[in-house]
Amino acid sequence: MSKSPVRVAVTGAAGQIGYALLFRIASGEMLGKDQPVILQLLEVPVEKAQEALKGVIMELEDCAFPLLAGIEAHSDPMTAFKDTDYALLVGARPRGPGMERADLLAANAQIFTAQGKALNAVASRNVKVLVVGNPANTNAYIAMKSAPDLPAKNFTAMLRLDHNRAASQIAAKTGKPVASIEKLAVWGNHSPTMYADYRFATIGGESVKDMINDDVWNRDVFLPTVGKRGAAIIAARGVSSAASAANAAIDHMRDWALGTNGAWVTMGVPSKGEYGIPAETMFGYPVTCEGGEYKIVEGLPIDAFSQECINKTLAELEGEKDGVKHLL
């Protein structure tokens, strides 16, 4: 029996990441090759953006995707999020030249408060929300706090790009296929302070830490490379990573919806105090997914260096949270 279509809302739909994302969702890469989708696309109510969105929709139509059951264009989150089952919040205010961090937080607080309220009012009660737009953890926290009638666990932030970047660096270092790496974790904020942790990782049952056996490489090469990869891409391409971010969003949502078969992945999720992180902090954790639910991998030993890294990324997140609390 064929499945009923699910509703997938995407914000910033005519942007670079949106363009790299929508065709893959419509082809079934995110929710499976048997799951029809209706795309509910949100762009800002500015003529240029709405015109660009029309062009993207024409292209989606021209692909004749068998799974694409409908496309809608919206300029208001209250209509874009109506009955949505999945919401990918990609659109955010980028940091402009000379813009202070406080201004960036305030501009995004406005966007994500409105979107959280709209989700609260009109989305499916089981909606799965992924915030991609930066600062992703804090934007997800703002949306969650603005949607008191939805379960906090429905709100997540994207750390999968950091996770995939870390896996790729480990594959290059060990000369092993990236798909063979298991039990990799990324802790904390989606920012250069994130802590990519391969202490538990294995390749073919063998410890990655033992294979690499180089703490200096970990500290001075691996962590800075993963942490500053976004900046390196901007320096090289002149624009921020879009295709790799879209790919990570697909990975995150696919695993959450369809499960990970016991494999660890990284998601930014609201803490309930795991590993001493204050409750409600939107924090990157290793998780497994099954039956549409994620579960934090608990009971992992945290050594002194790891604790130092976790404390640093937590301090940054707490600072961001303090920077927006008067706006909530």
Swiss-Prot record:
UniProt name for this protein: Malate dehydrogenase
Enzyme class: oxidoreductase
Superkingdom assignment: Bacteria
Swiss-Prot/TrEMBL catalytic activity: (S)-malate + NAD(+) = oxaloacetate + NADH + H(+)
Active site (UniProt): H190 (proton acceptor)
Species assigned in the record: Leptothrix cholodnii (strain ATCC 51168 / LMG 8142 / SP-6) (Leptothrix discophora (strain SP-6))
NCBIfam families: MalateDH-SF1, PRK05442.1
Gene Ontology biological process terms, A to Z: malate metabolic process; tricarboxylic acid cycle
EC id: 1.1.1.37
Binding site for NAD(+): G12, A13, A14, G15, Q16, I17, G18, N108, Q115, V132, G133, N134
Pfam families linked: Ldh_1_C (PF02866), Ldh_1_N (PF00056)
Role of this protein: Catalyzes the reversible oxidation of malate to oxaloacetate.
This protein's record includes keyword Heme: no
Protein family membership: Belongs to the LDH/MDH superfamily. MDH type 2 family.
SUPFAM superfamilies assigned: LDH C-terminal domain-like, NAD(P)-binding Rossmann-fold domains
GO molecular function, one term: L-malate dehydrogenase (NAD+) activity
Keyword NAD appears in the UniProt entry: yes
InterPro entries: L-lactate/malate_DH, Lactate/malate_DH_C, Lactate/malate_DH_N, Lactate_DH/Glyco_Ohase_4_C, Malate_DH_type2, NAD(P)-bd_dom_sf
Keywords (A to Z) from UniProt: NAD, Oxidoreductase, Tricarboxylic acid cycle
